[in-house]
Structures are given as C-alpha cells and as structure tokens.
C-alpha cells in the first residue's frame, strides 16, 4: 500500500497547481508509481466551478510529465462531474469498466453522451479504448444478459477477458495491497493479469499498424 497521509494529493495538482513531482509516490511494484487522492478531491468539484480553463487543469499538468511514462491510467470517480471531465480532456482514450449488473447499463448512455461532448468541444483526439466486464458471475442470468447487451453496444471493443466476482478482490484493498501481492493465485489476480496482457497486446498491435501507415 501507500501512505494515506501524504502531504500532497491530486487535489493539490488540480486546485493549487502543484507539480506532479510533489505528489507521485513509488510503490513496491517495479515501474509503477501512483498519484494518490483523498477525500479532499470531493471538494475540488465545487472549487473548480469558478476557475479559468477548469476542464483543462489536469491536462496542463500531465503534459509536463507524460513523456516519463509508457502509460498513465486515471481512475475516475463514478460521477460525471468536473474531475471526470478533467480526466477525459487529458486522456487519449477511455477504458470503461462495466459491472455485470442491471444499473450499470443504465449509466452507459449518459457516459457515452458525455464522451461525445468532450470529443466535440474539449478533446477531439479522445477515443473509446474498450469495455471491460467486471463482477461477472457465470451462475446468474442477469450477468450473461449484461454481457450480451454490452457486446451488442461496443461490439469488437469489448475485452475478451472478464473480471469475475471474487472474494479476494474485495479483501485486498482493506489490507492496503494490490491483488497480485495479496493473493497472486486467486481467480481475480489471474483475471487481471490476463487483462493486462490483452491490453498491452492490443495497444502494441495498434501502434505497429499506425507506424506502417
């Protein structure tokens, strides 16, 4: 895990324009660093409203450091507020996790509308990276119905690897550990390992195809 009492967090980057170098912390995992956030980020939604270029603040800071990394993943809150808009404006693509539950489908339309608006007004380069099915339980008809609907909606952009419901995945955060450290042999850890490999392969193939054009 990482120290939850860090002096700086993502809030300071967005609101106080602190450099990412002050916020980024190392982890036990090789080549993995993290920019933590905390409860103060919720207050950023209100403070951003009155700021100039409020949707661009994260992008402006990320441009200073992006060449230091192969990939930068932004874990967005479930709401479509200004923090999420900042994330979309700063991103090359969006990877959408979809829980295999009924209400997950309800929010997909609104999410896609928001991404389309961002593409039109704030970030014309943004694209859908893909959709990842999570909390999948093969025993339920509902989960299988959600899979069917998501594949119908996103077609070939749905990742083949699904993330199953798994007790170990639920337990790991409470111990401040990633699943690969908490229980690398669990179904959840193996699923995420396969998903990561599928993601890398997909991106490498796309980069190769782009280079050949």
Protein language model features and the residues they cover:
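P-loop NTP-binding core
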Residues: 1-213
